[in-house]
Amino acid sequence: MRYSQLLVQAAELAKTEPERAEELLRKAESIALNAYPDDMILCARCWEDYFHNHDNAMRCLLEAECRSSNTSGFLAVAAAHLRHFHNSQLAERCYNKALEKATDSEDHLRIQNFLSEFAPAKAEIETTNNKGWSHLKND
């Protein structure tokens, strides 16, 4: 069975049969480990969205980062950190790795596209996080 099918089944069973669903997700993860970083990102999203397990989600993202070997892989992980997990520090680390791996004009175009899409999100996350801390200090 393909890992994507396992992810779908895990999502469907998350509320009714959580133990079985976790088993399926772990199988999907073991397959995704040998594939592309995007596959581990999907596993991370499943852990977060259906099981509310942030630790396993972050572990999957770290695996995706470790298995990335090119600009597009690191940018995909950076995008996941920003879009789904709202973590600008980890996104920046992946972005810097993407910069280091950039070798040609296509890589530089990917980086420019990433910046165009995610610079506003990064600023918003940092502003929200700062407001959150300010709010807590004022209470």
Region annotations inferred by a language model:
Residues 106-139:
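Terminal, low-structured helical/coil segments at or just beyond the last alpha-helical repeat
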Residues 7-8, 38-43, 73-77, 93, ...:
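Alpha-solenoid helical repeat scaffolds
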Residues 11, 15-18, 36, 48-51, ...:
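Short coil/turn linking the two alpha-helices of tandem helical-hairpin repeats
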Residues 1-33, 129-139:
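N-terminal alpha-helical interaction modules that lie
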Residues 15, 26-76, 80-84:
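Alpha-helical adaptor scaffolds
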Residues 1, 34-35, 69, 106-109:
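Residue signature of alpha-solenoid helical repeat architecture, marking inter-repeat boundaries
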